């Protein structure tokens, strides 16, 4: 009886560990780039906050890991000017074993509101797999909620 109990506990521990490991290793890796501001009117701190909030929202979504890396800097300099994902950037992200790249843009609509747009691009083929946008007040208190909503719309599509 005691042997059966020990075997049952060991089996349960093995199944629990493999389930947790599978959930951990099956997470989709998303590289999150700098926020594009084609107008040049958005404060750098606001763009950093938006990127941070999107990284948090993606990372806190079940099945996803968000990555923001300083090593993207050289690519982001060119990316900030165009808003396009170059083949060099896709190749670099693939080498880092990232499945997706999140590209975001903030556009001032007036003095109080902005449009946050984002798309998730598959690094293996360059296809946009999800795209969404949200209009919000350009205030920190509203931006986090808008980023959470944006991330929810994006990860629900892949």
What are these regions (language model features)?
Residues 22-31, 46, 57, 92-95, ...:
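C-terminal/domain-edge helix-coil "capping" segments
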Residues 27-32, 41-84:
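N-terminal segment of the mature soluble domain
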Residues 61-103, 109-115:
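Short, solvent-exposed, polar/charged sequence segments at loop or secondary-structure edges
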Residues 17-21:
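Hydrophobic alpha-helical membrane-insertion segments, chiefly the h-region
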Residues 1-5, 22-23:
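Short, Lys/Arg-enriched, disordered terminal segments
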Residues 4-15:
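Sec-dependent N-terminal signal peptides
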